Curated annotation (Swiss-Prot):
One GO cellular component term: cytosol
Protein name, UniProt field: tRNA uridine 5-carboxymethylaminomethyl modification enzyme MnmG
Binding residues for FAD: G13, G14, G15, H16, A17, G18, V125, S182, Q373
Function statement: NAD-binding protein involved in the addition of a carboxymethylaminomethyl (cmnm) group at the wobble position (U34) of certain tRNAs, forming tRNA-cmnm(5)s(2)U34.
Length: 625
């Protein structure tokens, strides 16, 4: 077949999954093509103008630790930074940034355009070109008839795949923010034989900043103390003139307006067919499901420094536009607000993720990968994490190297992908800290310690990032060694000093590390007794030291659990396993095994509906092989 051009990797879709996938493949040396419907929407934020949040912020740190771009890009373009859950334990702390929406997209587009081995091109991909046996992808075809050869293809089409926007009774074919909908590719995936689902998400109205009465709202400032998503970012560059968000609430009048128009709500009238997100429901869904609540929180989030648009977080809706006008004016601070864009719902096709391997390669077609909302997830961060993994694995496949799979104990990205390919999802999947059984290990502060060496091994972490990481870890090791050797002795002046600080006396000599294990003690207080280190210890190293020492016992227990799970993961299941030969397992287990085809005993044990007895039978069978 004649191709216009040939590439190692072709990525379809330039959203948050697509840019990470294409950058990863190109940086690993693969000749890569990124095809996007609209060059002006590369890394565009069609919904909330923010990056991070609970669990999601840790994903961004993981992307950065592996050599990805999202963390670096938001650190260049944020307008506010805030650490969440600071009053809770380190396992659930996460960073959130308010983004300058346009700057974020422009900056990422420039990064993509400047990347060696990467070509950015506008076009609508209509068809995957397969080999004669229809088992391997060899290229793509666009709406203009142009064909490009590819050794691997990654689909990252987001909500554009047969996308339809819904506002009241109005329903029309569209991708996010009135971009083109991808119909041909959606049809093609069905023709190939993929099981396709239909999901829904939504976005709230935007209002004019100058029309808001901020005196009726509560200011939500950013943090003065520096924090960053990228491990490479410097505290010296931390933004001082941050832009605040504002908190307001729905009112009883808001709820009356909504209840009086529920018969016109697409969600309840039958116009919306797709399954919506459980953890980000529309406001009409919220007042129905939580009818006892007198009000709901709303956050007024500026979309950038050079725009008047303000996003009303928490007010996602697809109600008719006239209802939205009344709804907005029922909210304190927005009585005279001008609505610039109405909220809308968008329905789109998804490739049901049980059809994927842990590499995000499809089981049906060799060399074809999918990532992001195409796989049934929600959120920019979840998409970017999957895009990175798909891009790495596409490059490795082309290069004939071993595949890259993140374990549940290594990263939230690993938890997410394992959930998707093992359990599947019947609704838009969102990462939560509660989904991770090893969350004390998967923290914000140690993402580089967990993943940078892995990123270096696959060829994605640059020399500069690697040197920075090694210097940090060397300092961490030196200071940990010092804390474990320097001692506090039960001398009179020590006891007096402890009393003045509100600490109880010590009976025996303690190392600095032993003293730091006390829950009320922090690193700086330990230094008061054992003295300063001979070098200036970086703030991020101190944070890591405090957590590792304070929670040492809990971390050890978690690592013991990880070791047990790794033993199960080490037991591989043959690719062409005949599940009918396992006579003694339950019928439900056999059906699930046939559908998902788990690759390890560990993955099999996590499938919903499979009980320990089924796993024991499978283990005995495998040991007898």
């Amino acid at each position: 077949m004649n191709f216009q051009e040939n590439y190692d990797v072709v990525v379809i879709g330039g959203g948050h999954a697509g840019v990470e996938a294409s950058l990863a493949a190109a940086r690993m040396g693969s000749k890569t093509l990124l095809m996007t419907i609209n060059l002006n929407m590369v890394a565009f934020m069609p919904c909330n103008p923010s990056i991070g949040g609970s669990a999601k912020g840790i994903v961004v740190r993981e992307i950065d630790a592996l050599g990805g771009e999202m963390g670096r890009n938001i650190d260049k373009t944020y307008i506010q930074m805030k650490m969440l859950n600071t009053g809770k334990g380190p396992a659930v702390r996460a960073l959130r940034a308010q983004a300058d929406k346009d700057e974020y997209a422009d900056s990422m587009k420039n990064t993509v355009s400047d990347q060696e081995n990467l070509t950015l091109r506008q076009g609508m991909v209509e068809e995957l070109i397969l080999d004669e046996e229809k088992k391997k992808v060899i290229g793509i075809k666009t709406s203009t008839g142009t064909k490009y050869g590819a050794k691997a293809v990654i689909i990252t089409t987001g909500t554009a795949l047969r996308g339809e926007i819904i506002i009241g009774e109005l329903k029309y074919s569209s991708g996010p923010n009135n971009s083109l909908s991808s119909i041909g590719l959606a049809d093609n995936l069905r023709e190939i034989g993929f099981e396709i689902g239909r999901f829904k998400t939504g976005t709230p109205p935007r209002v004019l900043a100058s029309s808001i009465d901020y005196d009726k709202t509560e200011i939500q400032p950013g943090d003065e103390a520096p924090n960053h998503f990228s491990f490479m970012s410097s505290d010296e560059n931390y933004l001082k003139d941050q832009i605040p968000c504002w908190l307001t609430y729905t009112t009883e009048n808001s709820h009356t307006i909504l209840r009086g128009n529920l018969h016109r709500a697409p969600l309840f009238s039958g116009i919306v067919k797709g399954v919506g997100p459980r953890y980000c429901p529309s406001i009409e869904d919220k007042i129905t499901r939580f009818a006892d609540k007198p009000r709901h929180q709303l956050f007024l989030e500026p979309e950038g420094r050079n725009t008047e648009e303000v996003y009303i977080g928490g007010l996602s809706t697809s109600m008719p536009e006239d209802v939205q006008f009344d709804l907005v004016k029922s909210i304190p601070g927005l009585e005279n607000a001008q609505m610039m864009r109405p909220g809308y719902a968008i329905e789109y096709d998804v490739v049901m993720p049980h059809q994927l391997r842990p590499t995000l390669e499809t089981k049906l077609v060799s060399g074809l990968f999918t990532a992001g909302q195409t796989n049934g997830t929600s959120g920019y961060e979840e998409a970017a994490g999957q895009g990175l993994v798909a891009g790495i694995n596409a490059a490795l496949k082309v290069q004939g190297k071993s595949e890259f799979i993140l374990k549940r104990s290594e990263a939230y990205i690993g938890v997410m992908i394992d959930d998707l390919v093992t359990k599947g999802t019947l609704e838009p999947y969102r990462l939560l800290t509660s989904r991770a059984e090893y969350r004390l290990i998967l923290r914000h502060d140690n993402a580089d310690r967990r993943l940078t060496e892995i990123g270096r091994q696959v060829g994605l972490v640059s020399d500069e990032q690697w040197e920075h990481y090694q210097a940090k870890m060397a300092q961490f090791d030196r200071e940990m060694k010092r804390l474990n050797s320097e001692k506090l002795k039960p001398l009179p002046d020590t006891q007096e000093k402890l009393g003045k600080l509100g600490f109880g006396p010590i009976k025996d000599a303690l190392t600095g590390a032993e003293f730091l294990k006390r829950p009320e003690v922090h690193y700086n207080e330990v230094i008061d007794f054992i003295g300063q280190a001979p070098e200036k210890i970086d703030r991020t190293v101190i944070e890591l030291i405090e957590t590792e020492i304070t929670y040492e016992g809990y971390i050890k227990k978690a690592m013991d659990q990880v070791d047990k799970m790794h033993r199960l993961e080490a037991k591989r299941i043959p690719k062409n396993m005949d599940w009918d030969k396992l006579d003694s397992i339950a019928t439900e287990a056999r059906q699930k095994f046939k559908k998902i085809n788990p690759e390890t005993l560990g993955q099999a044990s996590r499938i919903s509906g499979v009980n320990p007895a089924d796993i024991s039978i499978l283990m005995v069978y495998l040991e007898g092989k």
